[in-house]
Structures are given as C-alpha cells and as structure tokens.
C-alpha cells in the first residue's frame, strides 16, 4: 500500500437530530446502525452524540456514514457537503426519498457523456445528496 493510500473511508454529517437522520438514511439508502458513540469530542472537549451507519452489521473497516451531533453548537444551516450515492434503481430511490421526508430538487436527468442518470435531493434537515444510477453500456 502506498504511503498516502487509505484502507477505507468515512464521512461525518453534522446534524441537529442524529436519531431522525439515522432513521432517514437507513430507510432511504439501506444502511444499518453499526455503533453509537457519545461523550466529549476528544481534544475538543465538547459533548457530542454520533450514530455510525454502514452497509454491514459491524465496524469492519468498510465505508461508513456518521450522523454527528455537537450538542452545544448551533446547528448547521448551510451546505457543508454533498453526499453521493450510487443505486441500481434511481426511480425507486426517488420514491424512498419522498416517502421518508426528503425533498427532490428537480427531475431525474441523464448525463450521457458521463454514463449516468442523476437526481439531486435534500434530506429532512436540508443536506444535499447527489443520487446516481449508471446507464447501461
């Protein structure tokens, strides 16, 4: 492995209500709760709660998405990150987004030069997601 390579990737989304957002991401994207952590944020000394989500049932070094709540900070209002998800059925995912309190931003569109169909949406707290389905070759 190269010195700058990494074995896995995790993303932390700062949220207002980690439980509500956990329910949303599990229902829409099929993720599972693999761990819950709370306490003081290490060297920062701030109270926090987080729920770690993954595609498996345990922390196995794979990719995770963490719903992270700083308990004493003002809640985020601006877009800090765009979460990207790849799916086999973008139309079905669109229905799940709406059914679970998300908001669709425009119609599904094709970017044939990139070989994808794309749908932008917001989760119930307004975080932006880019949802992609690969086009058949």
Task: Pin down the residues of each PLM region.
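Vicinal oxygen chelate
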Residues: 2-4, 9-13, 94-137
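Short hydrophobic/aromatic beta-strand element in the GNAT-like acyltransferase core
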Residues: 50-52, 84, 118-120
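Exposed loop/turn and edge beta-strand positions of beta-sandwich/beta-sheet ligand-binding modules
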Residues: 47, 79, 115
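A short beta-turn/loop motif at secondary-structure boundaries
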Residues: 40-45, 73-75, 110-113
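Short, solvent-exposed aromatic-acidic interface loops
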Residues: 70-74, 135
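Core segments of cupin and vicinal oxygen chelate
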Residues: 2, 12-61
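Short amphipathic alpha-helices within nucleic acid-binding modules
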Residues: 21-24, 90-96
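Eukaryotic phosphotyrosine signaling hubs
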Residues: 8-9, 78-82
């Amino acid at each position: 492995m190269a010195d700058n390579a990494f074995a896995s990737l995790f993303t932390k989304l700062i949220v207002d209500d980690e439980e509500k957002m956990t329910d949303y991401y599990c229902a829409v994207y099929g993720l599972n709760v693999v761990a819950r952590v709370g306490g003081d944020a290490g060297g920062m000394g701030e109270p926090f709660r987080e729920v770690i989500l993954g595609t498996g049932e345990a922390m196995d070094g794979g990719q995770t998405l963490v719903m992270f709540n700083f308990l004493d900070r003002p809640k985020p209002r601006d877009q800090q990150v765009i979460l990207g998800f790849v799916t086999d059925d973008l139309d079905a995912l669109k229905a799940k987004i709406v059914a679970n309190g998300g908001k669709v931003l425009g119609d599904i569109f094709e970017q044939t030069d990139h070989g994808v169909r794309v749908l932008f949406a917001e989760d119930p707290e307004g975080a932006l997601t880019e949802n992609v389905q690969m086009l058949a070759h």
